[in-house]
């Protein structure tokens, strides 16, 4: 008994020493990661905020102008406001359509149908293709159809808008579907059986059991589709390039055109980028707050 007590005491002593040593050297182990994070994110982030208040051509050649760049970004700049409105419309339509299509596919593929794994793989594959490549592929496809009517995707803003919506649905619906499938498969069969015993039909079971139980998946998918749609650049650049007359330019593309397309407007482009970051962050936080409250309620 005494030997066993000594053994446990010795183990506890060694454990305490190890814990003390880990606390002592934790900063040393974490330092490389912290340095990499500071170099790759923190320094560029705060430098970008500073440059948004300056007129500059290079980082070392800047002149403080205060809020002048922010005034130029909004006042007398219809391109930025048009890009904002276009982005908001596109985001709303894309978030709803992508999640709706993904959820319907997830419901169908969790019913024990044959070839389910093949369908999952096929639906997920578009997400593996780069945005620039997807943009050019869909430009060829859509123009191939529209040219039969004597127009192309840059003929009207509505063609560019719906072309981008179709592209985003094709790219992201499969990825969101996988997340929804995981959520649906985690629902206990006892809950569905209890609902059926209580006389609930398929629609009532869907609304009162399935959807409340997959709210965590809905939160994730809504967040991903919202942020990806709002900050879309590659596909917009390749599919329409903002044509016709910048009517289909989204915010990210408008910032790119301002920064690289107009000499002396680098500071204005940086100011737009700061505003863009704040907008995306605020919208994402509001969405997470609302959907997480739904999780708690359900």
Which role does the model predict for each range below?
Residues 1-17:
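Short, Lys/Arg-enriched N-terminal segments with co-localized hydrophobic residues
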Residues 19-298:
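A structural signal for multi-pass alpha-helical bundles of membrane permease subunits
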């Amino acid at each position: 008994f005494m030997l066993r007590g000594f053994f446990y005491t010795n183990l506890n002593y060694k454990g305490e020493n190890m814990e003390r040593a880990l606390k002592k050297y934790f900063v040393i182990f974490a330092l490389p990661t912290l340095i990499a994070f500071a170099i790759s994110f923190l320094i560029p982030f705060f430098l970008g905020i500073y440059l948004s208040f300056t007129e500059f051509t290079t980082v070392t050649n800047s002149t403080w102008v205060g809020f002048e760049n922010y005034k130029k970004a909004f006042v007398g700049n219809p391109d930025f406001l048009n890009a904002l409105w276009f982005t908001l419309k596109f985001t709303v339509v894309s978030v709803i359509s992508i999640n709706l299509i993904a959820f319907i596919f997830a419901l169908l593929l969790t019913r024990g149908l044959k070839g389910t794994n093949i369908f999952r793989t096929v639906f997920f594959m578009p997400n593996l293709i780069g945005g620039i490549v997807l943009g050019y592929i869909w430009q060829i496809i859509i123009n191939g159809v529209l040219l039969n009517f004597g127009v192309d995707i840059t003929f009207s803003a509505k063609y560019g808008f719906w072309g981008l919506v179709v592209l985003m649905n094709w790219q992201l619906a499969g990825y969101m579907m996988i997340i929804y499938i995981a959520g649906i498969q985690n629902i206990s069969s006892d809950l569905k059986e209890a609902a059926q015993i209580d006389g609930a039909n398929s629609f009532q079971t869907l609304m009162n059991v399935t959807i409340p139980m997959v709210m965590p998946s809905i939160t994730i998918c809504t967040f991903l589709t919202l942020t990806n749609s709002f900050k879309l650049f590659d596909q917009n650049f390749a599919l329409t390039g903002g044509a016709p007359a910048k009517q289909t330019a989204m915010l990210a593309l408008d910032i790119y055109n301002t920064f690289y397309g107009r000499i002396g407007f680098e500071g204005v482009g940086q100011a737009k980028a700061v505003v863009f970051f704040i907008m995306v962050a605020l919208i994402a936080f509001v969405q997470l707050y609302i959907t997480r409250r739904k999780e708690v309620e359900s």
